[in-house]
């Protein structure tokens, strides 16, 4: 086989951080001059997360080729240089759809279609297709869910078969949780033992056990896990809870020397690992002595910490080159004291979303920021809120609205894109990377320092082309358009400290090592506003 595979499973509890672990391993392996590809196998029966409630699943991360994916792919992107595509994710829904389509087309020649071999063979095809497309040295495969879940069984069986076919080219990492009982002052290994027993009963013996824990594991505890789980003691690694930032994870794993173990096991020769640049970025990110800047997030799904995961991370990325310490203030658009909360912030970000709830609150936030000269950044639906607010209060069209919120509005300044009125919702939006031509002399141009960029999209509605001329006549600047049809991509509010809206999702391209330029300029504007307020108060 031309590539090696690392399979990552999780046990004991969910939310162990397998996605962060996989992303961190990718970074460490790339620092060994190896090409890495990544694949997430998700057991849920949805075809993709595109129609799932953000309160249940968190954000939907979009790839360049327009695939709606799990938020873990966002972690893969932010930590490493892996190329992500439709080959980087597969769900049970996709697998079963493919199998049933083949059955309807007669490809199984009348055989009784079963989980084994038909479903498991399709999963193996997915693994092979990812490797064939990305051509990596090492493929990291994260299996979603927890050992013991019935939904995961076909994926684990496929992994077992794949390992049997390629025993020298595969390695299994099992991630578990090792609880600490404060009352007894003891670390308990029994849950890990049972989880490994479950995995071995399926036919997969882990090569590595990675233990999440609140407290460091002693040599004695590692020896006990080694004995009862049938792995060498030096193959038991510890990932203690991170206190400052998720970006410490690669440093923690490097300290455990896990990448050297993996490389030796897979037949590679480890090289000295230099993470000094990453260490510097983490230290800068966690430096609380820098100037404090408060950013208000006026969003619909703030109760779920992962609903705007990429937005949160992009803001923190930008705080490093902006040299400030960021405080993110969640503000519910329905709050009675919305404007009071905004008045205490140095900047406002209005992220994307769908549906009528919270819409008017976002428009109120946009108006307040425009009139009070507070830096404001609108993304996707947030940009549409900026445009509708401008039409209502500057163009004097009080009934202006988006057709998503009111299909009968007399002034539909935001309308549905042509061909988007499909009854089928899954995967039918304008998705993926599209070009955007930047207007010279604009805030966007100052940020990007180029006249053509590629950004990722996920939307059905656009600024109504028939209103653009009137909006521009009243001062709104169209700072970016898609050359493929002249769709409005970026708007800016003139004579303002910094107010900009984008139809795309710049957060999907941001990394700690390469923050997105629009986020950097937004945070710099908020920092300047914070300094201005502080100087005014000291007079």
Swiss-Prot record:
UniProt keyword list: ATP-binding, Glutamine amidotransferase, Ligase, Magnesium, Metal-binding, Nucleotide-binding, Pyrimidine biosynthesis
Presence of the UniProt keyword Nucleus in the record: no
The organism's place on the tree of life at top rank: Bacteria
Reaction equations catalysed: UTP + L-glutamine + ATP + H2O = CTP + L-glutamate + ADP + phosphate + 2 H(+); L-glutamine + H2O = L-glutamate + NH4(+); UTP + NH4(+) + ATP = CTP + ADP + phosphate + 2 H(+)
Protein name listed in UniProt: CTP synthase
Stored PROSITE patterns: GATASE_TYPE_1 (PS51273)
Domain Glutamine amidotransferase type-1: 294-532
InterPro entries: Class_I_gatase-like, CTP_synthase, CTP_synthase_N, GATASE, GATase1_CTP_Synthase, P-loop_NTPase
EC number: 6.3.4.2
Origin species: Chlamydia trachomatis serovar L2 (strain ATCC VR-902B / DSM 19102 / 434/Bu)
Keyword Zinc: no
């Amino acid at each position: 086989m031309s590539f090696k595979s690392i399979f990552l499973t999780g046990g004991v509890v969910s939310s162990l951080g397998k996605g962060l672990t996989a992303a961190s391993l990718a970074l460490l392996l790339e620092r060994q001059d190896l090409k890495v590809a990544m694949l997430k196998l998700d057991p849920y029966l949805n075809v993709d997360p595109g129609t799932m409630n953000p309160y249940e699943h968190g954000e939907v991360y979009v790839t360049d080729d327009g695939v709606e994916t799990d938020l873990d792919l966002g972690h893969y992107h932010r930590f490493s240089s892996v190329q992500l595509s439709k080959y980087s994710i597969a769900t049970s829904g996709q697998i079963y759809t493919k199998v049933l389509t083949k059955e309807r087309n007669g490809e199984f020649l009348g055989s009784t279609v079963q989980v084994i071999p038909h479903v498991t063979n399709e999963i193996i095809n997915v693994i092979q297709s990812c490797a064939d497309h990305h051509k990596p040295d090492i493929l990291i495969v994260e299996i979603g869910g927890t050992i013991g879940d019935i939904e995961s069984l076909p994926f684990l069986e496929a992994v077992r078969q794949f390992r049997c076919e390629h025993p020298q080219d595969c390695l299994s990492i099992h991630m578990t949780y090792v609880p600490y009982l404060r009352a007894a002052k003891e670390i308990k290994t029994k849950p890990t033992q049972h989880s490994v027993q479950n995995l071995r009963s399926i036919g997969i013996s882990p090569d590595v056990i990675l233990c999440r824990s609140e407290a460091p594991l002693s040599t004695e505890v590692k020896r006990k896990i080694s004995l009862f789980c049938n792995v060498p003691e030096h193959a038991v690694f510890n990932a203690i809870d991170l206190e400052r930032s998720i970006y410490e994870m690669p440093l923690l794993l490097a300290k455990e020397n896990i990448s050297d173990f993996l490389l030796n096991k897979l037949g590679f020769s480890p090289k000295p690992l230099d993470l000094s640049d990453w260490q510097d970025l983490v230290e800068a990110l966690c430096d609380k002595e820098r100037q404090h800047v408060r950013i208000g997030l006026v969003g619909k799904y703030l109760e779920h910490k992962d609903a705007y995961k990429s937005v949160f991370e992009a803001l923190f990325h930008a705080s490093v080159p902006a040299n400030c310490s960021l405080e993110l203030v969640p503000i519910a658009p329905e709050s009675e004291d919305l404007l009071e909360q905004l008045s205490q912030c140095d900047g406002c970000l209005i992220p994307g979303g769908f549906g009528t709830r919270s819409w008017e609150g976002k428009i109120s936030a946009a108006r307040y920021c425009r009139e009070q000269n507070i830096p404001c950044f609108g993304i996707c639906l947030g940009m549409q809120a900026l445009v509708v607010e401008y039409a209502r209060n500057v163009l004097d069209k009080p009934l202006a609205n988006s057709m998503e919120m009111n299909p009968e509005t007399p002034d539909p300044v935001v309308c549905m894109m042509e061909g988007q009125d499909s009854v089928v919702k899954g995967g039918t939006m304008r998705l993926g990377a599209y070009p955007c031509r930047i207007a010279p002399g604009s805030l966007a141009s100052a940020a990007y320092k180029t006249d053509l960029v590629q950004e990722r999209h996920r939307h059905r509605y656009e600024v109504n082309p028939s209103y653009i001329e009137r909006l521009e006549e009243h001062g709104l600047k169209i700072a970016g358009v898609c050359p493929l049809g002249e769709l409005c991509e970026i708007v800016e509010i003139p004579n303002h400290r910094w107010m900009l809206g984008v139809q795309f999702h710049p957060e999907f391209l941001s990394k700690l090592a390469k923050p997105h330029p629009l986020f950097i300029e937004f945070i710099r504007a908020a920092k300047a506003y914070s300094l201005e307020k502080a100087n005014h108060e000291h007079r």
